[in-house]
A protein has these predicted regions:
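Alpha-helical transmembrane segments of multi-pass membrane proteins
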Residues: 18-36
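Interfacial segments of alpha-helical transmembrane regions
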Residues: 7-14, 81-95, 150-160
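Interfacial helix-start motif at the membrane-water boundary
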Residues: 45-65
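Internal transmembrane alpha-helix with an interfacial aromatic "cap," most often the third helix
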Residues: 61-89, 136-147
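Membrane-interface interhelical loops and short amphipathic "cap" helices
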Residues: 36-51, 111-121
């Protein structure tokens, strides 16, 4: 069996990011009276004036750092491996993660919902990019899986992830 290196362990930070984000999404509504998860965006929980902002920041503190480190080491690990199409899909996903991590921190909603301020316009622009890349990257990975047997498992996982969106 191959010895695991630092990059392998950094890849596990994706699990930490998932747990941090899940905790923020599950528990922050408890600090937001009247929050309706069926009618309101998750961004409302981290809006500049949201009553849940402090709890959101605490619970999601590890999310951005861990997601960016994880996706970056995945990009490092995939270099020169598999197909160019698969790598392109993974790199697009990494770009989406970086845009999400930086963009949402720079431009949280100014108010729950949409107040129309410059900050809100930028938040929506970040959201549009994140949504576009969140769809494009798995589609490219699915195509890579359909074209190459060595990428099939990546394609299946991407198809499941896309279906869950």
């Amino acid at each position: 069996m191959k010895k695991k290196n630092f990059i392998n362990y950094c890849g596990l930070l994706g699990v930490v990011a998932f747990l941090s984000y899940t905790a923020a999404v599950v528990f922050s509504p408890l600090a937001y009276p009247g929050y309706n998860w069926m009618a309101q965006a998750v961004s409302d929980l981290s809006a500049a004036n949201a009553p849940s902002l402090a709890l959101w920041n605490q619970l999601s503190a590890l999310y951005n750092v861990c997601e960016v480190v994880c996706v970056t080491v995945v990009c490092i690990g995939i270099q020169g491996r598999k197909t160019k199409l698969l790598r392109s899909g993974i790199y697009l996903f990494a770009v989406m993660e970086w845009i999400s991590a930086v963009g949402y921190r720079m431009f949280p909603l100014s108010d729950s919902g949409y107040a129309g301020a410059f900050q809100d316009v930028m938040h929506m622009a970040v959201t549009a990019l994140v949504v576009l890349l969140s769809i494009a990257s798995p589609v490219i990975i699915i195509v890579a899986g359909a074209k190459s047997k060595s990428c099939r498992s990546y394609g299946v996982c991407a198809a499941v992830a896309l279906a869950m969106m």
